[in-house]
C-alpha cells in the first residue's frame, strides 16, 4: 500500500463516514417523528 494513497483515502473516508452518520441521524429523527 502506497503511503500517499492512504494520505488521500483517510480524509475522504472520514468525510464520507461523517456525512453518512449525519444523514442517518437526521433520517432517524424524521422517521421517529412520523411514527410517533
UniProtKB/Swiss-Prot annotation:
From which domain of life does this come?
Answer: Eukaryota
Q: Which GO terms describe its molecular function?
A: manganese ion binding
- Where does the record say this protein resides? Plastid, Chloroplast thylakoid membrane
Classification via Pfam families: PsbY
Q: Name one GO biological process term.
A: photosynthesis
> What stretches pass through the bilayer?
5-23
User: How the protein sits in the membrane?
Assistant: Single-pass membrane protein
Q: Which residues lie on this side of the membrane: Lumenal?
A: 1-4
Q: Kindly report the protein's main subcellular placement as a broad class.
A: plastid
A single GO CC term for this protein reads: chloroplast thylakoid membrane
**Entry keywords, A to Z:** Chloroplast, Membrane, Photosynthesis, Photosystem II, Plastid, Thylakoid, Transmembrane, Transmembrane helix
Keyword presence, Ubl conjugation:
no
Q: Which residues lie on this side of the membrane: Stromal?
A: 24-36
Keyword match Metal-binding: no
Q: What does this protein do?
A: Loosely associated component of the core of photosystem II (PSII), it is not always seen in crystals. PSII is a light-driven water plastoquinone oxidoreductase, using light energy to abstract electrons from H(2)O, generating a proton gradient subsequently used for ATP formation.
Self-association and partners: PSII is composed of 1 copy each of membrane proteins PsbA, PsbB, PsbC, PsbD, PsbE, PsbF, PsbH, PsbI, PsbJ, PsbK, PsbL, PsbM, PsbT, PsbX, PsbY, PsbZ, Psb30/Ycf12, at least 3 peripheral proteins of the oxygen-evolving complex and a large number of cofactors. It forms dimeric complexes.
The family assignment reads:
Belongs to the PsbY family.
Protein's UniProt name: Photosystem II reaction center protein Y
Protein source organism: Pyropia yezoensis (Susabi-nori)
Q: Which gene encodes it?
A: psbY
Amino acid at each position: 500500500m502506497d503511503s500517499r494513497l492512504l494520505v488521500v483515502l483517510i480524509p475522504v473516508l472520514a468525510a464520507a463516514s461523517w456525512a453518512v452518520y449525519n444523514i442517518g441521524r437526521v433520517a432517524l429523527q424524521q422517521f421517529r417523528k412520523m411514527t410517533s
